């Protein structure tokens, strides 16, 4: 049996990054409509399915709850419902940044892409410049990629969250291209429920604190057609999700918000996801359990690291795991490492060979 070709990544037209593994093809565009994986470019080689989205893991704003303390946010309408919020740092990354910095590296059995940008405007009393950084890892042998969004604050925030599209909005015409939606905190929902527009708080809304915390945070749609898979977004730590929408507004809006935590200047918070194709809900659950509770991703040419907390690079082969904002830190930290090489994390030297789970001590 012939061996699979190694993973590949190249720069194409307009600086786009073109990625290919044995299971997936994808593109990341740092110009135009930016962040995440470009709309309709995530191709499942097994089924030829595409994502039918506006993009996967797409980034918007830094926001806060309620009407006080920031730039006004329109609500009491069909698009935003009756949920009061305000903007803290803006503009919207996906539509208004126009260009984000990016790089990529090809490892032995994966491709890693990084994108980053700083918000240019801020609400009164705050300063602009908080950093958004996104890391995407495309492993061989998997029909999904691993993604992580990290925010590093330049402000003292009492209660901040990041708005994302996760896995990504679904473009459709009266349910023509999907059979059903699955939300782990609610269940299976037929396509017929998304024929007419309704607000995010009309139905299928998840809010941390008012809804039970699910054991898994899975949001997926079943692509229509014989042999077609589910496209899913799995947030590996359900507790980092503060709100999630699944409502119809000409398309199915899969907004997901992460955080709602206090931060000091220099603090970071992050969430990690699996995004891609699965043949069953049971398969999604197995992969969610495989990396349950992990929130942050970093990578070199030799290995990738998926950890609790927020993993930060301190130098060549040296990393530090920090708490999520001002939330208390567990001790020790759990870390999954994949690849081959050596890494120093919180002062502990790790030898990585294959995919292994480690415990790393707390370090200030």
Residue ranges of each PLM-predicted region?
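C-terminal beta-sandwich/jelly-roll accessory domains of carbohydrate-active enzymes
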Residues: 301-364
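Acidic, contiguous internal or C-terminal segments within carbohydrate-active enzymes
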Residues: 102-174
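Short, Gly/Pro- and small/polar-rich lid/capping loops
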Residues: 2-14
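Short, well-ordered beta-strand segments enriched in hydrophobic/aromatic residues
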Residues: 19, 23, 134, 145-153, ...
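Acidic-aromatic substrate-binding/catalytic surfaces of carbohydrate-active enzymes
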Residues: 14-122
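Beta-strand-rich recognition/accessory modules
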Residues: 12-22, 203-315, 340-349
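Polysaccharide-binding surfaces and accessory modules of carbohydrate-active proteins
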Residues: 155-230, 347
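Short, acidic/polar linear motifs in exposed loop/turn regions
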Residues: 153-157, 279, 325-327, 339
């Amino acid at each position: 049996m012939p061996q699979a070709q190694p993973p590949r990544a190249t720069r194409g037209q307009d600086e786009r990054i073109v990625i290919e593994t044995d299971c997936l093809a994808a593109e990341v565009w740092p110009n135009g409509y930016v962040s995440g994986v470009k709309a309709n470019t995530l191709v499942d080689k097994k089924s030829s399915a595409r994502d039918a989205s506006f993009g996967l893991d797409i980034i918007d704003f830094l926001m806060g709850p309620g009407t006080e303390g920031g730039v006004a946010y329109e609500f009491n309408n069909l698009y935003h419902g009756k949920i009061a919020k305000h903007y803290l740092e803006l503009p919207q990354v996906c539509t208004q940044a126009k260009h984000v910095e990016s790089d990529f590296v090809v490892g032995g059995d994966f491709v890693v892409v990084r994108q980053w940008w700083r918000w240019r405007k801020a609400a009164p009393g705050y300063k602009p410049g908080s950093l958004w950084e996104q890391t995407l890892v495309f492993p061989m042998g998997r029909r999904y990629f691993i993604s992580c969004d990290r925010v590093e604050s330049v402000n003292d925030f009492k209660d901040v969250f990041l708005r994302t599209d996760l896995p990504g909005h679904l473009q459709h015409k009266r349910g023509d291209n999907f059979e059903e939606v699955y939300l782990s905190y609610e269940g299976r929902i037929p396509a017929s429920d998304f024929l007419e527009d309704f607000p995010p708080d009309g139905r299928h809304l998840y809010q941390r604190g008012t809804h039970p915390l699910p054991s898994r945070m899975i949001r997926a749609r079943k692509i229509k057609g014989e042999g077609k898979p589910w496209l899913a977004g799995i947030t590996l730590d359900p507790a980092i999700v503060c709100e999630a929408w699944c409502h119809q507004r000409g398309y199915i809006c899969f907004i997901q918000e992460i955080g709602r935590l206090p931060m000091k200047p220099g603090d970071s918070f992050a969430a990690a996801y699996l995004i891609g194709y699965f043949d069953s809900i049971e398969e999604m659950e197995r992969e969610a359990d495989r990396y349950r509770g992990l929130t942050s991703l970093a990578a070199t040419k030799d290995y990738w690291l998926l950890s609790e907390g927020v993993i930060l690079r301190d130098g060549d082969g040296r990393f530090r795991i920090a708490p999520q904002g001002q939330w208390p830190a567990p001790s020790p930290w759990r870390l999954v490492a994949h690849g081959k090489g050596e890494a120093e994390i919180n002062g502990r030297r790790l030898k990585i060979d294959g995919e292994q789970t480690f415990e790393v001590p707390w370090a200030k």
